[in-house]
Amino acid sequence: MSTILQTTDSASQVYALEITCPLGLENVLEKELHGEGLTQTRLGEAQVKLTTDLEGMYKACLWSRVATRVMLPIANFKMESADDLYDGVKAIQWSDHMNASNTIAIDCHGTNHHIRNTQFGAVRAKDAIADYFVALSGERPSVEKEQPEVRIALRIKREVVTVSIDLSGESMHRRGYRQQGGMAPLKENLAAGLLLRAGWGTDCGLTQLIDPMCGSGTFLVEAAMMSLDMAPGLRRPYWGFKGWKQHDHRMWQQLMDFAKNRKKDPATLGIRFQGTDREQKAIAAARENIKRAGLTDVIDVTMSSFQEHEFDINPDAPGLLITNPPYGERIGDEMALIALYRQLGEWVVTHVRGWQFMMLTSNDHLARQIPVRPEKSTRVINGGIECRAYQFPLLAGSIKEDVVAQSVMTPGAQMFANRLQKNAKKLKKWVEKNKIQCYRVYDADMPEYSVAIDIYGNWAHVQEYQAPKSIDPEKAKQRLFEVMSAIPTALNISESNVILKQRQRQTGKEQYEKFDQTKHEMIVEEYGCEFIVNLKDYLDTGLFLDHRPVRKLIQDKANGVRFLNLFCYTATASVHAGQGGARSSLSVDMSNTYTEWARRNIELNEFSDRYHQVERADCIEWLKQSRDKFDLIFMDPPTFSNSKKMADILDIQRDHGELVRLAMARLARGGELIFSNNYRRFVLDEALEQEYDVKNITRETLDPDFDRNDKIHQCYIIKNK
């Protein structure tokens, strides 16, 4: 049997409302309601319960910036079977709330043993309401999912069902100024709640507001609406109570008229609202939203980074800086954002002392890059992601200099920085003497910091080795953050020039994995040769640094030779051969990507494609079919490959004997094969040493940046006896 919660005596009827809001902002909502004279409240989880009359109900709808929905519970009942749901809904006096001619929609939330999916629950409730009106008048309401005249909410919690009228009709974050679709920005009611939590509001005493990464401008618009005392519900074209039978149109219109008159004149406001964003789409959306909100003369937004933009700041007036920077969904994204968060912290400390500062982020590691300890934080949910809104004390005007100047590096990061500086110092003379631009400065020297760091000019390329399953992922993540925070200081490299990739065991096509479709290329030099490298788009960069001495050896041996480069990758060895005076070169690889890259490297160094050719082919099949002879052959096959382009699976330990013999068959009299591979447990087939003159030159092909790891590759010179 239904317990009826609301009746329809008169306009003086008292209603017990449930006003929902973003989790974590319940206190803010309650304070907001009290400010409108709605004081009979009780806090709940993600809601405030309000007892009020019809006018108070309208005020909550019209003036609440933080509320998500205003719900009017009309009945609750116990449900012990699916039939109980039907019976309980049908027992409600629906004629008190609507007519049979109204359109309805039913939202069902929650399930139990009897109602296992929400769609079934909504259908049973709809049938009950239809049957109620058929029995009463012979008519039934029709269903309208989008903007019905009466929206009904069904909440199932364990064995109890609560039935409510959704007076808001749809989420109250929809103010009417933001176009739906496209970008998925911060919701308006969450933005408003955070602004209120940060101390912003009508007549709050703050006269400047900046959002340095403003996106579609939600913080700016909501803040301006508060300062102008604009009712957030004033522009909404749709409300759920307009089809409700107890709606008083005259009272609502009077409250609307009062709200319009309450709005302040923007010309007398005296408050600056400024925003920047680097994305053209974001700024275009912000400008459109600002225009639709009628705030074009109040808010200034510019397409620019906050670092480069000159904000109009009054140093003697208090203000609020509030922003929702990117969080980084993937670990690589997070690492790239370290620089952005540091720059934000430094900019705030430098430019807006004495202000309030709030930052919303889901990533506490990134939050720690702000060089100030947060005073407090609020847990909220933004777009399904758990976040925290951090409030920083520097901005109260009493910040201590040692807090601002404190290093953002943890003891672990400082220890890692010390190791990097030690390694760099050890390599410095060798780098300068040989004019080395690209070299390895660190390779998992400390087991707990399992990364390889390569220098490419003024860039650092970081590869994280995949941690064993025994390592706590959070601990591994923390150590990686320490690595990334240490590199800029230790190696004197801009934070924005530190690139991270995650390395793991490669199989098949993953060896050629592309990260995105944008080319991020640069040109580097090595012993008179120029190479195109790409630090961002692929797992590898286009230049194997450990083979630097092998390439130099090829250059020294290449004068007048016919050179063959098998499994050529980007043909850097062929370029060295050309630089050394090779008569001709042929570079063979099965990858479309790398053969095209190889051609570009050869063209970059101005070698004629008539004499220095690139061919896409399965190297094993090519060797079986070729009858050409070469004076110098370089063969650096992968450890493993199962590409569909190959006739068979390649396993270098198992197959290297056949490969070497095929290559040796292509050697001219007196020629040499340089055979290398990167399999750390590689053992050369003893039969090859019986058949050929084999010399292990691995030690001679390790430069100082790789001499800590004699397993980085295995290299041999093989000649016919």
From Swiss-Prot:
Its EC number is 2.1.1.173, 2.1.1.264. This is Ribosomal RNA large subunit methyltransferase K/L. It is found in: Cytoplasm. It comes from Marinomonas sp. (strain MWYL1). PANTHER family: RIBOSOMAL RNA LARGE SUBUNIT METHYLTRANSFERASE K/L, RIBOSOMAL RNA LARGE SUBUNIT METHYLTRANSFERASE K_L. The keyword rRNA processing applies. Keywords: Cytoplasm, Methyltransferase, RNA-binding, rRNA processing, S-adenosyl-L-methionine, Transferase. Its main location: cytoplasm. NCBIfam families: PRK11783.1. Residues 56-167 form the THUMP domain. It comes from the Bacteria. It catalyses: guanosine(2445) in 23S rRNA + S-adenosyl-L-methionine = N(2)-methylguanosine(2445) in 23S rRNA + S-adenosyl-L-homocysteine + H(+); guanosine(2069) in 23S rRNA + S-adenosyl-L-methionine = N(2)-methylguanosine(2069) in 23S rRNA + S-adenosyl-L-homocysteine + H(+).
